[in-house]
From Swiss-Prot:
Active site per the UniProt annotation: 113 (n6-amp-lysine intermediate)
Effect on the protein upon substituting residue 113 to A: Complete loss of nick sealing activity in vitro
Purpose: Catalyzes the formation of phosphodiester linkages between 5'-phosphoryl and 3'-hydroxyl groups in double-stranded DNA using NAD as a coenzyme and as the energy source for the reaction.
Reaction(s) the record says it catalyses: NAD(+) + (deoxyribonucleotide)n-3'-hydroxyl + 5'-phospho-(deoxyribonucleotide)m = (deoxyribonucleotide)n+m + AMP + beta-nicotinamide D-nucleotide
SMART domains: BRCT, LIGANc
Domain called BRCT: residue spans: 560-636
One Pfam family of this chain: BRCT
Protein name per the record: DNA ligase
Alphabetical GO biological process terms: DNA repair; DNA replication
Lineage, broadest ranks: Viruses, Varidnaviria, Bamfordvirae, Nucleocytoviricota, Megaviricetes
UniProt keyword rRNA-binding present: no
UniProt cross-references to InterPro entries, sorted A to Z: BRCT_dom, BRCT_dom_sf, DNA_ligase, DNA_repair_Rad51/TF_NusA_a-hlx, DNAligase_adenylation, DNAligase_N, NA-bd_OB-fold, NAD_DNA_ligase_OB
């Protein structure tokens, strides 16, 4: 789950993809697949899943991940009477599509790829069964849902032969509208229903689930005939059309149209050769493939790498390339991630890179098509960090860009309005290049700054003084930037909640005592504690200087040390409530986004016992409470 959390925290998967190795990607794919197929929960998007699969093919083409179908069933499982495979995927790649077309002469059935829960329905000796796909070999028996979901059982009873048919349990866009406030998407909704125990299924919710069929396994025939048989039986059938031929452009057009017009969520289209084929008993059929389209990318030539120091002195690469137009937008810059990426991929003038617009917003490099002769590194002194990932200015404290960024951060963090990086730059250029110098500035001093008129000088001065009047030790620790990367309000708050006077009480002689105390705080390891205490003497010196000019207010913890949620972890599902989160934290607890063995309480929407988090909480024996019960008990 650590890799999944890393992906979720990133602005875009492309931003962290270069840092993931094959093992990382296999973990992310395995965990997300397990959640997707066993709980109905999508930890990552379909696009992110496909990107990770493509990257894994580059790093480890023989990975076991590529042989997996679905995910192993959790809980009671049954052997499926027929193999339930998946589909090979082809992107918007003209060569790959043409290669497939050369093998299969058509005609072709193009149908919707429904984004629901894959299942198998069988009738044998007049006995009807319904199964989930599971891992293709073993699934769950969910026959109990047949009397609850939106399917006419009478139609099945009229079928007077043994059959095996595949379909998708899915909720229509229209039906899902009533649930969109409590569930992220229709698939998660259906997944929760499917994974509920028979006695816990919400019947009203289940009644909104359709079963759409798309394959007749037994009796076998060409696909168009299979779909016709399903219609003759009166069952709901996937949307499809028959084509004499097609190309990539037609597939893109069909996909775009179906995403707009389909009454159900689809995550692609399925292309099948419309001739009779021997059904495969393992792997995926060669005569069909899934087409999901492709995120537009384009090759371009690197002009240079621009290195800019961060407030911590880390030199951050930004790549300027020959201007290109992608998705109707002109692009000429992208992130270079870090120095290691630039060096490993030899990115410099003349390199050819492939660029994608992530989410149609930010451009990222997907891969390097042709490296430069050598990487484009900065012409200033720098050192590598201990991990060999970033390069850092050799002389951080005297770099003007670093000084400006640190001062800007200080002003922003203390709440000094209108003191932007532009204003800070002018102050530094005028010689006011330290925090003590700036907080001691008079209104007359501001008037000496180039471009400052009386009104602006008065405004900036008053805003600064107002923020300094309310400055407490927590804000000062965060704004100072003395403790460096990895430290922010949350970590400082954790320390001050327990030891509010640590700044005044710490001495070198008591270092070992404080080290033991801080290691007892949740989330603090040896590296964090060593870094914090290592910088404490520097912060104490800074604090004394600042305290001569203004009075720093002490930190007053809002946390009740004997609170009713002391050392407890609460999870909300189906809703968010900032006031309740603050209440729980002030009472000594914390709010998490996922259910685990460390969860103390799950609060869920009334009637939402079918949600994946609720089911997991019950499996782990975690206490649960409805939203209305929580409100009645704790809101006054």
């Amino acid at each position: 789950m650590d890799i999944i959390k890393k992906i979720k925290k990133s602005k875009s998967l492309w931003a962290i993809l270069p840092s993931l190795n094959a093992t990382d990607i296999e973990e992310a794919l395995s965990v997300s697949s397990e959640y997707y197929h066993n709980t109905g929960t999508s930890l990552i998007s379909d696009q992110e899943y496909d990107i990770l699969m493509d990257r894994l093919k580059e790093l480890n083409p023989s990975s076991k991940i590529f042989a997996q179908v679905g995910a192993p069933v959790k809980g009671k499982k049954v052997k499926l009477p027929f193999w339930m495979g998946s589909m090979n995927k082809i992107k918007a790649d003209e060569k790959a599509v043409n290669k497939w077309l050369n093998e299969y002469s058509g005609p072709y059935v193009i149908s919707d790829k429904l984004d629901g829960i894959s299942c198998l329905l069988t009738i044998k000796n007049n006995k009807t069964k319904l199964y989930t796909r599971g891992d293709g070999t073993y699934g769950q028996d969910i026959t109990h849902l047949l009397g609850l979901i939106n399917i006419d059982i009478g139609l099945l009873e009229e079928i007077d032969q043994d059959i095996a048919i595949r379909g998708e349990l899915i909720m229509s866009k229209k039906n899902f509208e009533k649930y969109q406030e409590i569930m992220a998407n229709a698939r998660n909704m259906v997944g929760g229903i499917v994974n509920s125990k028979p006695e816990s299924v919400n019947k009203d919710h289940a009644a909104d689930v359709d079963l759409i069929f798309y394959e007749v396994i037994k009796p076998n025939d060409k696909l168009s005939r299979q779909l016709k048989i399903l219609k003759e039986w009166g069952l709901k059938v996937v949307y499809y059309n028959i084509y004499k031929t097609f190309d990539v452009n037609i597939l893109e057009s069909v996909l775009s149209e179906r995403k707009k017009k389909s009454g159900y969520e689809i995550d692609g289209i399925i292309v099948t050769d419309n001739n009779k084929h021997v059904r495969n008993i393992s792997g995926n059929p060669s005569y069909s493939f899934a087409f999901k389209g492709d995120t537009p990318t384009i090759d371009t030539v690197v002009k240079r790498v621009i290195w800019t120091p961060s407030k911590d002195g880390v030199l951050v690469p930004r790549i300027k390339f020959k201007k290109v137009r992608l998705s109707n937008v002109d692009l000429e810059y992208t992130t270079g991630f870090n120095a290691k990426y630039i060096v490993d991929n030899k990115i410099g003038s003349g390199a050819i890179i492939n660029v994608v617009r992530s989410g149609d917003v930010i451009p990222y490099i997907t891969h390097v098509v042709k490296p430069a002769k050598k990487p484009d590194l900065p012409n200033i002194e720098y050192v590598w960090d201990k991990n060999g990932v970033n390069i850092i200015l050799a002389d951080i404290n005297d770099n003007e860009t670093v000084i400006i960024k640190r001062l800007t951060k200080f002003m922003r963090n203390i709440g000094a309005e209108n003191i932007s990086e532009g204003i800070t730059t002018r102050l530094v250029e005028a010689g006011f290049d330290t925090i003590p110098k700036i907080i001691n500035m008079t209104e007359e001093d501001f008037l000496t700054i180039d471009g400052f008129q009386e009104r602006l000088a008065e405004k900036i001065y008053n805003n600064l003084q107002n923020s300094l009047d309310n400055l407490d030790i927590l804000t000062l620790m965060d704004a100072s930037n003395i403790f460096g990367r990895g430290f922010g309000t949350k970590k400082f708050k954790k320390i001050l909640d327990v030891y509010p006077n640590i700044v005044n009480q710490y001495t070198k002689e008591t270092d070992n005592i404080w080290r033991k105390k801080l290691l007892d705080i949740e989330g603090f390891d040896t590296i964090t504690v060593n870094k914090f205490l290592g910088e404490m003497p520097n912060f104490q010196k800074f604090y004394k200087v600042i305290n001569k000019t203004i009075t720093i207010k002490p930190y007053i913890s809002e946390v009740n040390s004997e609170g009713i949620f002391q050392n407890q972890t609460v999870v909300f599902t189906g809703f968010r409530n900032a006031d309740w989160q603050k209440f729980i934290e002030n009472e000594g607890g914390k709010v998490s986004g996922s259910v685990s063995k460390n969860t103390s309480l799950l609060v869920y929407n009334d009637g939402e016992e079918s949600s994946a988090k609720y089911q997991k909480a019950k499996q782990l024996g975690i206490k649960t409470m409805t939203k209305s019960s929580f409100s009645k008990k704790f809101e006054k």
